């Protein structure tokens, strides 16, 4: 015992412990302190005998006679060092040093290798039990009051894989005890696996177990349709929580498990999607950690949601609730990991769905703009098409409503303004297309939202017009419509046009009869002169008179008279002058209308001839006395007021605005359906438009809406009155909107459509009924294809289908008039180009129809802008495809193959080149034998003197040796001293992408690294002291970066990283943000990813943790020798 009365050693209270001195010192190093601590590790905590202090008293005689006792270091055993330490800890330098020392200590502790526990781990044994004893054991496991120490002796053998998970769900074992059981069984299985395969790597075993566990969860979700909803919900919740614990305890491979769950694709039902989405939402915390899995999750959710929208689930309330959850989940995911929304190849398809889901979030546009920027930058890199073709595909396949500002930004990123605007104008007047009703509107809308100077667009348009020669009639009319529309929008001035002709000297007497002026007169004679000054009219008349061009304006009065006599069958004469059409419509619009349908037809004609903007301008200038509201409304229905006065008018305005690509947003409450029908009767004056049977039915009380709608569909089927078909279809459309798209509507529409196709013959009236169905949004392109394919498979002769396709593809067989049906037919053909089902519909139509001249023109118009692969898919008959291309491209038959190729490379445009490539695919090997790799490469290089951007790639895409030619050109372009055009280098990027998609040849990959490295080093040397890169060098660097991006997945290109990184610090590079982004993106993708060993898959540590303790590495250093295996645990767990 210590003597409490003895005094402290002299000077004890003044002494300061060594550790405190070091902590308090502002000059001491924490490394010195750690060295000191390491030197004292072996020193015991207490010295029971200190020779320097307690040795002297043993020598004294008093100690011999009375005995020795040690001097206590403190006055009392209850003494505290608090006061001694507190005065030092209050100093700021002391706290700062303590923080540094502690951080260093903990860091070294984590890096230290911890010795294995003194006792080797022995997994608990398993015994073979009968089924009844096994069930009793599992019941004991599920009872928290049964200690695990009693269960560990009789762990049942044979429970593993899906069986162990099924039993845990069945007996509702608490999660901590369930994890213990899985560990006990799993560690035995793992050791058995290691003994069996004679290895120490358990990676394969962990992945197999993860695959089985994930498969059990997926099969459980798939079994929902045959399960009780309440028991299934409990089991599903338990199972998700159990898998959450398995992930947290590292008993499954996280990446492998999450990838399996994300990749699961059940049926397209609402229930299956809900369960799958709930699982993804539950594991979202783990998903966010792996960007590539998270990206796949986003794509899976969006694609499944798109399919749900197409299938139109019956329970709209549940679908609405699920949509809110999906939108919130994706929005949160984008905020936490925006990299998961980087999927350039899928962006175009999934972007509309993202906008639909996020439209209610107030700040989603900022997030969407970031995604749009990243995906659009990388989009063309992954798609092997030229910028010009990509440009044309975007504007040819627009789906309304359109985000015009984003569209304009994307388009002019693909092509500069000096190239993009002429191509846009060329697309607008392309005479081969029959779908030109809204092209002028698209062009002006893009101009309105592009950040370009208006004078620049005027100059580019003027230059484009002066280069138009020679022109066909349709192109002249289209050009006149375009110029008239742009003039009304302020993007063209006829006075500047005439002044430019005068400044170029073409208005001199000697030049007025030149071939150039003959081409210009073809356009001038079509121009309306209503809004021109008298001086300008006189100049145009003078120019026209020199070429013997005259316009007979008296024809306009004859057209007005014919319209008043029979507006249903009224049509303008084929190849009528556009100026006469414009003046005739203005005169018709200026006379009072006796029927609302006449107003409607005037609006329809205005849309058909792209005169909406012109008509509005004329009304505003008081040049036409016409209902301004009716014109400004721009709808296809019988509404004469922009401000809707009834619920039916609101519905009609909102729906029909889509037809003219005008967004008319009106807020309205759900109307009373019976009242809506009454208002519709008042608008349409049904007594004179409907059959007698319908009038009688209308007077009856509409007690059952479904019966009433069934009667309307039946009335369309049997009706022989054209007006009855029109107005009944319109009423069905209104009811569909008012009743919130009831599910039986689509069934009735498809059944009616099918009955029309299954008749003995398809009359023109039956075909018009189908067009009315499509125009009134009762049928979609997908539904039309589904019905047509079913009828085609069910019938043998398909006579009705042949008549249907002949009417669809050959408008010349129609009777005069029927402008509304002609309009719906052109809209249907245009929409079919955008859908896979639409392409399949045309493919079947081309197979069944009669191939006359008019049908061949329609097919020729339909396949424009598509690449040769799509064209070959739509028209698989190679003989007919060759006949079609040679019929419209006469030069193909008159020249030898090499001369024809040479001419195609310098004369074809973006519209004709894919068709030439399609023709090449129809030739046999003998005909192509002269087009060897060397010959084709030589002809391409010869065309550089008269280079047309992107044309050579489109032309060569039809050759069987296209990839090989591209590879030769890529290697040729890497030579150091070549001065290639900038546009050609840009086009080589598309060739590189094509080679990447087709998988490059081995000989090309062997030759590529050396010239690529030399080209990069040469570029680095040349740009060392340059302040600003010219266009050629920018194009070369862009090409080199894209070549690396495309090929790094096939060949090792890490040797180029050093050169790429050195370029990022050059002034001429980092001042160019676009080039810098491209370089950094290239470096990021090419830099090798260092694969870290996955501890979950490589070690049994998580499985041997039977006591469910934290890892020893997480304990403080003082507790590392603590062994929990020899400690008794609380009885609530064991």
From Swiss-Prot:
It holds the Pfam family Med12. One of its GO terms (cellular component) is mediator complex. Keywords: Activator, Nucleus, Repressor, Transcription, Transcription regulation. GO terms for molecular function: transcription coactivator activity. The keyword RNA-binding does not apply. GO terms for biological process: negative regulation of cell-cell adhesion; positive regulation of transcription by RNA polymerase II. Its main location: nucleus. Transmembrane segments: none annotated. It is found in: Nucleus. The keyword Transcription regulation applies. PANTHER family: MEDIATOR OF RNA POLYMERASE II TRANSCRIPTION SUBUNIT 12. Belongs to the Mediator complex subunit 12 family. Component of the srb8-11 complex which consists of rb8, srb9(TRAP240), srb10 and srb11. The srb8-11 complex associates with the Mediator complex thereby blocking association with RNA polymerase II and leading to reduced transcriptional activation by Mediator. Component of the srb8-11 complex. The srb8-11 complex is a regulatory module of the Mediator complex which is itself involved in regulation of basal and activated RNA polymerase II-dependent transcription. The srb8-11 complex may be involved in the transcriptional repression of a subset of genes regulated by Mediator. It may inhibit the association of the Mediator complex with RNA polymerase II to form the holoenzyme complex. This is Mediator of RNA polymerase II transcription subunit 12. It comes from Schizosaccharomyces pombe (strain 972 / ATCC 24843) (Fission yeast). The lineage of its organism: Eukaryota, Fungi, Dikarya, Ascomycota, Taphrinomycotina. The gene is srb8.
């Amino acid at each position: 015992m210590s003597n409490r009365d003895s005094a402290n050693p002299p000077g004890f209270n003044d002494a300061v412990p060594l550790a405190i001195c070091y902590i308090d010192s502002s000059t001491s190093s924490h490394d010195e302190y750690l060295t000191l601590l390491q030197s004292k590790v072996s020193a015991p905590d207490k010295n029971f005998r200190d020779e320097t202090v307690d040795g002297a008293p043993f020598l004294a005689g008093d100690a011999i006679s009375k005995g020795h006792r040690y001097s206590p270091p403190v006055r009392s055993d209850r003494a505290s060092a608090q006061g001694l330490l507190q005065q030092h800890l209050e100093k700021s330098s002391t706290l700062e040093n303590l923080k540094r020392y502690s951080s260093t200590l903990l860091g070294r502790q984590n890096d230290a290798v911890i010795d294995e526990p003194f006792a080797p781990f022995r997994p608990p044994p398993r015994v073979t039990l009968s089924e009844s004893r096994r069930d009793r054991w599992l019941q004991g496991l599920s009872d928290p009051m049964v200690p695990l120490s009693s269960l560990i002796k009789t762990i049942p053998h044979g429970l593993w894989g899906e069986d162990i998970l099924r039993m845990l769900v069945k007996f509702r074992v608490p999660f901590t005890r369930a994890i213990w059981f899985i560990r006990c069984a799993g560690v035995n299985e793992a050791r058995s696996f290691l003994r069996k395969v004679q290895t120490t790597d358990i990676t394969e075993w962990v992945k197999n177990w993860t695959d089985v566990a994930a498969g059990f969860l997926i099969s459980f979700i798939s079994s929902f349709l045959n399960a009780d909803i309440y028991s299934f919900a409990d089991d599903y919740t338990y199972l998700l929580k159990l898998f959450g614990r398995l992930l947290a305890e590292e008993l499954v491979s996280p990446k492998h498990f999450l990838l399996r769950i994300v990749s699961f694709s059940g049926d397209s039902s609402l229930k299956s999607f809900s369960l799958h989405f709930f699982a993804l939402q539950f594991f979202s915390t783990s998903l966010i950690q792996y960007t590539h899995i998270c990206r796949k999750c986003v794509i899976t959710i969006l694609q499944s949601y798109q399919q749900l929208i197409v299938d139109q689930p019956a329970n709209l309330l549940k679908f609405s609730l699920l949509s809110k959850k999906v939108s919130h989940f994706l929005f949160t995911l984008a905020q936490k990991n925006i990299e998961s929304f980087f999927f350039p190849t899928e962006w175009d398809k999934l972007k509309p769905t993202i906008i639909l889901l996020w439209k209610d979030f107030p700040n989603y546009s900022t997030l969407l703009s970031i995604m749009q920027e990243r995906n659009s930058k990388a989009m063309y890199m992954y798609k092997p098409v030229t910028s010009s073709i990509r440009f044309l595909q975007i504007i040819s396949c627009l789906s309304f409503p359109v985000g015009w500002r984003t569209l304009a930004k994307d388009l002019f990123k693909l092509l500069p303004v000096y190239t993009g605007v002429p191509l846009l104008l060329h697309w607008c007047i392309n005479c081969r297309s029959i779908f030109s009703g809204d092209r002028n509107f698209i062009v002006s809308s893009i101009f309105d939202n592009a950040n370009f100077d208006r004078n620049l667009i005027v100059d580019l348009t003027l230059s484009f017009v002066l280069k138009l020669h020679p022109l066909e009639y349709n192109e002249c009319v289209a050009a006149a419509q375009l110029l008239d529309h742009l003039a009304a929008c302020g993007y063209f001035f006829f006075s500047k046009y005439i002044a430019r002709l005068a400044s170029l000297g073409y208005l001199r007497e000697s030049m007025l009869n030149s071939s150039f002026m003959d081409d210009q007169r073809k356009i001038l004679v079509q121009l309306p002169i209503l809004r021109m000054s008298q001086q300008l009219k006189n100049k145009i008349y003078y120019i026209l008179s020199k070429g013997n061009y005259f316009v007979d304006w008296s024809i306009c009065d004859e057209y007005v008279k014919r319209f008043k006599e029979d507006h249903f069958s009224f049509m303008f004469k084929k190849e009528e002058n556009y100026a006469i059409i414009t003046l005739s419509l203005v005169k018709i619009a200026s006379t009072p209308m006796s029927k609302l349908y006449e107003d409607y037809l005037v609006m329809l004609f205005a849309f058909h001839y792209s005169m909406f903007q012109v008509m509005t301008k004329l009304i505003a200038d008081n040049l036409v006395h016409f209902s301004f509201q009716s014109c400004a409304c721009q709808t296809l229905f019988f509404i004469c007021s922009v401000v809707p006065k009834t619920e039916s008018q609101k519905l009609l305005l909102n729906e029909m605005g889509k037809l003219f690509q005008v967004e008319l947003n009106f807020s309205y409450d759900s109307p009373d359906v019976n009242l809506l029908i009454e208002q519709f009767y008042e608008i349409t004056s049904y007594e004179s438009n409907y059959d007698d049977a319908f009038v009688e039915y209308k007077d009856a009380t509409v007690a059952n809406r479904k019966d009433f709608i069934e009667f309307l569909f039946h009335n369309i089927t049997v009706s022989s009155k054209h007006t009855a078909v029109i107005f009944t279809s319109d009423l069905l459309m209104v009811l569909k909107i008012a009743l919130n798209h009831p599910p039986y509507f689509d069934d009735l529409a498809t059944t009616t459509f099918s009955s029309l196709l299954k008749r003995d013959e398809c009359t023109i009236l039956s075909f018009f009924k189908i067009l009315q169905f499509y125009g009134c949004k009762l049928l979609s392109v997908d539904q039309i294809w589904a019905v047509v394919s079913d009828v085609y498979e069910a019938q043998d002769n398909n006579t009705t289908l042949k008549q249907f396709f002949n009417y669809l593809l050959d408008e010349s067989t129609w009777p005069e008039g029927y402008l509304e049906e002609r309009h719906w037919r052109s809209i249907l053909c245009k929409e079919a180009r955008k859908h896979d089902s639409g392409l399949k519909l045309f493919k079947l139509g081309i197979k069944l129809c009669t191939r006359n001249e008019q049908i061949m023109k329609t097919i020729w118009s339909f396949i424009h802008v598509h690449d040769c692969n799509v064209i070959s898919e739509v028209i698989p008959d190679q003989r007919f495809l060759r006949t079609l291309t040679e019929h419209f491209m006469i030069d193909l038959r008159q020249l030898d193959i090499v001369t024809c190729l040479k001419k195609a490379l310098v004369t074809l445009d973006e519209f004709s080149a894919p068709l030439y490539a399609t023709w090449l695919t129809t030739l046999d090997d003998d005909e192509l034998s002269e087009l060897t790799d060397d010959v084709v490469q030589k002809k391409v290089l010869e065309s550089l003197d008269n280079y047309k951007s992107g044309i050579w790639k489109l032309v060569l895409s039809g050759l069987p040796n296209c990839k090989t030619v591209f590879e030769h050109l890529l290697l040729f372009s890497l030579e150091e001293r070549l001065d290639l055009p900038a546009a050609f280098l840009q086009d080589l990027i598309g060739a590189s992408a094509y080679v990447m998609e087709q998988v490059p040849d081995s000989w090309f990959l062997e030759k590529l690294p050396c010239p690529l490295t030399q080209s990069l080093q040469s570029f680095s040397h040349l740009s060392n002291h340059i302040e600003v890169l010219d266009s050629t060098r920018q194009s070369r660097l862009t090409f080199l970066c894209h070549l690396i991006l495309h090929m790094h997945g096939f060949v090792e290109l890490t040797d180029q990283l050093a050169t790429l990184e050195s370029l990022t610090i050059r002034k001429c590079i980092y001042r160019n943000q676009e080039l810098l982004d491209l370089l950094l993106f290239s470096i990021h993708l090419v830099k090798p990813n260092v694969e870290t060993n996955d501890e979950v898959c490589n070690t049994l540590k998580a499985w041997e943790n039977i006591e469910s303790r934290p890892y020893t590495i997480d304990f403080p250093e003082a507790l590392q020798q603590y062994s929990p295996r020899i400690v008794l645990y609380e009885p609530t767990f064991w």
